[in-house]
Design a protein with these regions (language model features):
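S-adenosylmethionine
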Residues: 1-451
Length: 451
């Protein structure tokens, strides 16, 4: 049993209170991100993790509460701080803060009755030694949240509050104040399910009650449990954000060509390349992640060569095309992974950019004369995108940029930069239904090696 769950062990057997287990799990998940810096997906997938004993309904509720708490963390903290004149006992984050934040999220932002959110938070506090002395504080604070909800409108209506100051500041400097605010607003909505289909996007969109994006991605607002959806077990489609599906499209016709997909797991782009008829070598340094890729390829019916190796040190020969989706800060994926904004620090960007530079040089060494190299990251930071490509082209004269035309990405001019690269933002693709809006923030550039 990991330390993450120690404080959640009840001092006496848990009673039958309906919904308590889901709230406790949500509190564990939030505390794991904020205090222990454990990614949300890592906690969800961990053997013996907080959701392991929950039924599907409670699992979904726990994830929803934790996700909402992370998306609106800045606002919720500001409200709690306003109500606690002396601050949190103990001086900061911990299980008590997680209980208050998840409780406030339910009261202010979710379709949960006030009395249920308050009483279950108090039950949590009373059940555990570390927080039992503060049960009256939990009760009073959350009752005040419910009673004073109209007083908090100005806080809740400012999207910038929910982005760490360092990150929002970078966005303002890079994209300007209005666009930074639009990005923050887009990240407040949970991302829809995006899928890449092998054929006939319109048919699948109709089957799922979704829409087809300009690039052919099918988007579904309320899909349900993914493995239970039609066509999943048959391998007719795979989950992949619309922005993440763009880089592999930039190679054009690759039928019969040898293509290396570096840093490939979990395999969405690998699947695209294989579906396009390429002979694909998929590389990843993580054997665990590579196993997941292999499972995905088997489900989809694609035959690819999977190699466990470090892309920076691999000696795999030359290829007609190389795709490098480099490890990055992932600041473009906050709408889909709300924990990212609270796990990363500004200093991480410098070290990641240096690593990307080394990987880019290594990837270039695998491109045959006349071949194509596509570099991509799911980051909004220029150091990991535009600046990375400018520096690479300055030091390697063998390569030049081959600009992307809007016609190659469904006529979507908004996402093509003046240099001919791809730059998507979370605020792109607005839709009347917020659940169908937005994209992951992505950067991609296409380079060709001289013959």
């Amino acid at each position: 049993m990991t330390k993450t769950r120690v404080w959640h062990r009840a001092t006496k057997p848990e009673g039958p209170t309906q919904g308590l287990a889901a709230r406790r799990a949500a509190t564990i998940l939030l505390d794991g991100v904020l205090r222990r810096k454990q990614p949300l997906d890592e906690q969800l997938e961990a053997e013996g993790g907080p959701l392991v004993d929950l039924d599907p309904r409670d699992r979904a509720l726990a994830r929803a509460i934790a996700g909402m708490s992370l998306r609106r963390l800045g606002s919720l903290r500001a409200i709690i701080d306003q109500l606690l004149a002396k601050g949190l006992p103990g001086g900061g984050s911990g299980p008590l803060e997680a209980m208050l934040v998840t409780g406030a999220a339910q009261i202010l932002l979710m379709d949960v009755p006030d009395h249920a959110a308050v009483s279950l938070a108090v039950d949590q506090a009373q059940a555990h030694r570390a927080t039992k002395p503060f049960a009256p504080l939990v009760n009073a604070t959350l009752r005040n949240v419910a009673r004073m909800r109209d007083d908090f409108r100005s806080i809740l209506n400012d999207p910038s509050r929910d982005v760490p100051k360092w990150l929002h500041g970078r966005r303002v400097r890079t994209y300007g104040g209005p666009q930074a605010l639009a990005i923050a607003a887009a990240e407040r909505s949970e991302a829809a399910l995006d899928i890449t289909v092998k054929s006939d996007p319109a048919r699948w969109a109709e089957a799922f009650g979704g829409i087809v994006l300009p690039t052919g991605t099918v988007r579904v607002a309320d899909a349900g449990v993914v493995p239970e959806l039609p066509g999943f077990s048959e391998g007719d489609w795979w989950v992949q954000d619309a922005a993440a599906a763009l880089p592999a499209r930039l190679f054009g016709d690759i039928r019969g060509k040898r293509v290396a997909d570096l840093c490939a797991a979990p395999g969405g782009k690998t699947a695209q390349l294989a579906a396009a008829g390429a002979a694909v070598t998929a590389l990843d340094r993580s054997r665990h992640r590579l196993q997941r890729l292999d499972e995905n390829m088997k489900r989809l019916g694609f035959d690819v060569e999977a190699v466990a190796a470090d892309a920076g040190a691999w000696n795999g020969g030359l290829f007609d095309a190389v795709l490098l989706d480099a490890p990055c800060s992932a600041t473009g994926t906050v709408r889909r992974h709300p924990d990212v904004a609270h796990l990363k620090e500004e200093k991480d960007i410098t070290s990641l950019a240096a690593h990307q530079s080394r990987l880019l040089d290594a990837a270039a060494g695998h491109v045959a004369p006349g071949g194509t190299l596509v570099y991509a990251t799911c980051s909004l930071e220029r150091e990991e995108g535009e600046n990375q490509i400018a520096a690479f082209l300055a030091r390697d004269s063998r390569f030049s940029r081959r600009p992307v035309a809007a016609s190659e990405v469904g006529g979507w001019e908004e996402i093509v930069t003046d240099d001919g690269d791809i730059r998507t933002l979370p605020s792109h693709f607005p839709h009347e239904n917020p659940r169908l809006s937005g994209l992951d923030g992505f950067f991609a550039a296409r380079l060709v090696r001289s013959s």
